[in-house]
């Protein structure tokens, strides 16, 4: 049976239909860094009620943990943008699948992204949300893939800078798999 390498014991853990993963960032490393980012955000938005917008589906776990770590009075919202098919490479320009429900005008908006690679999706979202006149609009990303950058985008809060490897776990997927893993891993078969 195929499995994934668990980060804490180095043993194989069964995961139906999955190959092996090489752990890049452990659950403890992620939790520690997200807590630090949450404290920084709490300090930066003290006295404000920011709107945390997750880019679905990849940023859902990051947004939830970041919101808890900040301990702020805040609002959560979501949007979905896609440029991917079932493959791991972009298939075209980003397109909005579902929009935020909140009115962002005059609000402090913090866009939560799981990974920023080419920068195209984040640039597209920043343009779309920026046209609605928020009081401020900044990006928090768990992972920053600088080697893949095609468009420069401003990133205010960065969890980790990583290489160009395709990664999964902690909300990030490969063909809708691996999102539920508590760590970030690199699929061995890729």
Model-assigned labels for residue ranges:
Residues 1-190:
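PRPP-associated nucleotide enzymes
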């Amino acid at each position: 049976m195929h499995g994934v390498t668990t980060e804490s014991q180095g043993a194989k853990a069964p995961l139906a239909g999955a190959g092996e993963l090489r752990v890049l960032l452990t659950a403890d490393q992620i939790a520690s860094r997200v807590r630090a980012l949450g404290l920084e955000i709490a300090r930066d938005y003290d006295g404000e009620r920011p709107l945390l917008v997750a880019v679905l589906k990849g940023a859902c776990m990051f947004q939830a943990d970041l919101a808890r770590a900040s301990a702020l009075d805040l609002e959560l919202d979501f949007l979905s943008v896609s440029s991917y098919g079932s493959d791991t490479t972009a298939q075209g320009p980003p397109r909005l699948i579902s929009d935020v429900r909140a009115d962002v005008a005059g609000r402090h908006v913090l866009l939560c992204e799981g990974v920023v690679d080419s920068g195209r999706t984040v640039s597209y979202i920043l343009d779309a949300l920026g046209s609605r006149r928020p009081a401020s609009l900044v990006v928090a990303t768990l992972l920053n893939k600088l080697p893949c950058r095609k468009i420069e985008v401003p990133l205010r809060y960065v969890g980790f800078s990583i290489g160009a490897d395709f990664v999964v776990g902690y909300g990030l997927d490969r063909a809708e798999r691996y999102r539920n893993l508590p760590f970030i891993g690199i699929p061995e078969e890729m």
